[in-house]
Amino acid sequence: FYTGKIFDAYEFLGAHPDKDGTTFRTFAPAASRITVIGEFNDWQEWELNKTYDGNFWECYAKGAKPGMMYKYRIYRQDGNCVEHCDPYGFGMELRPNFASIIRDLSHYKFKDSKWMQKRSVCKDKPLNIYELHFGSFKKPYEKADDWYTYVEMIDILIPYLKENDYNYIEIMPLSEHPCDESWGYQNTG
């Protein structure tokens, strides 16, 4: 984990529901205390316990179900605390709010097997990478203060990328970030 080479940390960290509740697990080596607050406990603090090497925290919240919102309340060594979304959360509340949302991904089926088979065939071709910032690429004409969803963007973006011979996309931002005017370099998670 500490070398940055664990690519499936999302299977361990974050909120993982089962039939009776949800296991919450996060990495916070500098925290003195962490609690989880959410709809399942009327936003009252439930303690997370230090586990493993003392840098990970976890608790099981009976009754915490998919679709419910939650946040971590992280206490620093100086005694101050801050409410934080889950950096490994699978769902997020829309801005300006920042709660994470419990999601059950156990039934999700990836539909990219054709792409996965084809992707290794392109190693000898030149790269043409488009750095895409979703918030500034294009906005709906009829809703200038809003953004397209990822699904809505497909019919706009794919033809543009093909027309300009891009074969890779760097998507920014991938994580929730605190300021809509930024490019998303400062993740909230």
List each model region and its residues.
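The feature marks proteins involved in alpha-glucan
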Residues: 1-23, 43, 51-131, 136-145, ...
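Conserved, mostly hydrophobic/aromatic
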Residues: 26, 72, 132, 161, ...
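Short proline/glycine-enriched turn/loop motifs at strand-loop junctions of beta-rich domains
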Residues: 27-34, 41-43
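Short, solvent-exposed loop/turn segments at secondary-structure junctions
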Residues: 30-31, 134-139, 175-177
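Short beta-strand elements bearing conserved aromatic residues within extracellular beta-rich modules
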Residues: 34-36, 70
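Conserved residues at the C-terminal ends of beta-strands
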Residues: 37, 135, 172
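Catalytic domains of carbohydrate-active enzymes, especially glycoside hydrolases
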Residues: 52, 155-177
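Aromatic- and acidic-residue-enriched carbohydrate-binding clefts of CAZyme catalytic domains
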Residues: 128, 143-146, 177-189
